Amino acid sequence: MDLRATSSNDSNATSGYSDTAAVDWDEGENATGSGSLPDPELSYQIITSLFLGALILCSIFGNSCVVAAIALERSLQNVANYLIGSLAVTDLMVSVLVLPMAALYQVLNKWTLGQDICDLFIALDVLCCTSSILHLCAIALDRYWAITDPIDYVNKRTPRRAAVLISVTWLIGFSISIPPMLGWRSAEDRANPDACIISQDPGYTIYSTFGAFYIPLILMLVLYGRIFKAARFRIRKTVKKTEKAKASDMCLTLSPAVFHKRANGDAVSAEWKRGYKFKPSSPCANGAVRHGEEMESLEIIEVNSNSKTHLPLPNTPQSSSHENINEKTTGTRRKIALARERKTVKTLGIIMGTFIFCWLPFFIVALVLPFCAENCYMPEWLGAVINWLGYSNSLLNPIIYAYFNKDFQSAFKKILRCKFHRH
């Protein structure tokens, strides 16, 4: 999103955004006595062209692979991946429709395509970048519903619902990109024919920055925060259930014996006895008994004889080996749960960290600069870095949302090896 602002300190459209440190063209021509560029300027243009060209090509290639993978691999054709595919299409539009003109503007450090193309460029820039950001919100919202209401959302998670979310992102994008073309801009925006800048009207600045970034940012932080809490709760709950199930399943198979309570101390009848109070938690199948917390040992007297068989229970000293095994299993299970929590934190951290890293500097400058253009100064090279940092999010999105997915990785390998068979 190419938001630029003019400053009284620099009449050549010093921007907060993609204007770079440039050598004055007239001075360059006078210094050489010809129309040739001075060496530093030529070197800058070559290096910048190569770097930005590589960024654009990588972004086109990466997002194209995501779209192709979803289109060709049936296993990837689900609602969650439809949103990722739509994000890839949006970022592909940024890479094809916006970035080439932005790169030309960056390299030449002046706008050479006329005012009408400038208006179209700004509108496409704001539309596509805003839609890309809002797609991230749609993906976060879909994941939030899926993890907090998994049973009911299975039926609600339909292609139609995905289409509604995608349509909303584009409608909001249009509502932010169109107003400047309808007159919501200041007179100074077109004062310099060599500059192509977004509307610097204060009202539009607040409207566009909050609609395109700050509100989506808050929404994503809330959603991913709740997703993390829900995921952590589910992981820990699963571990507790598994441990409880393991403990309750520790039964003693006693099918050969029959239990009879002692009847008036009759030593001939079959009996079971214990040294302490016995509290079995619940009976097991096939004549087995689950041990209780106070259970020490179980003495079995066969029905047809007086021979006794003593079976140690899990919490007796004789069964310490069973306890050790159980403790090791529990410890391993908890380590796995902790690893899953860390992976969840890492994944959410990468998603939010990349988004904030790419766009927050841009929108801070976009919001502040129009209100203090006469008093604020920012080096042109820094404005260029901030501008292209935002654009680079279109390159990083397919890496974060698709390339880390094993199913996508498999599809990408098939595409690259040209051994793809739809199945």
Swiss-Prot record:
GO BP term, example: serotonin receptor signaling pathway
One GO term describing the cellular component: plasma membrane
KW Chloroplast (keyword) present: no
Disordered: region residues: 311-332
Transmembrane segments: 48-68, 83-107, 117-141, 162-183, 203-225, 348-371, 380-404
PROSITE patterns hit by this protein: G_PROTEIN_RECEP_F1_1, G_PROTEIN_RECEP_F1_2
Chain ranges for the short sequence motif NPxxY motif as given in the UniProt record: 397-401
Motif (DRY motif): 142-144
Gene3D superfamilies registered for this protein in UniProt: Rhodopsin 7-helix transmembrane proteins (1.20.1070.10)
Location (main, coarse): membrane
Ranges facing Cytoplasmic side: 69-82, 142-161, 226-347, 405-423
Disulfide bond annotation, renumbered to this chain: 118-196
One annotated GO molecular function: G protein-coupled serotonin receptor activity
Extracellular side stretches: 1-47, 108-116, 184-202, 372-379
Binding-site residues for 1D-myo-inositol 4-phosphate, renumbered to this chain: 320, 346-347, 353, 404-406
Membrane topology classification: Multi-pass membrane protein
Family: Belongs to the G-protein coupled receptor 1 family. 5-hydroxytryptamine receptor subfamily.
Name by which UniProt lists this protein: 5-hydroxytryptamine receptor 1A-alpha
Species per Swiss-Prot/TrEMBL record: Takifugu rubripes (Japanese pufferfish)
GN (gene name): htr1aa
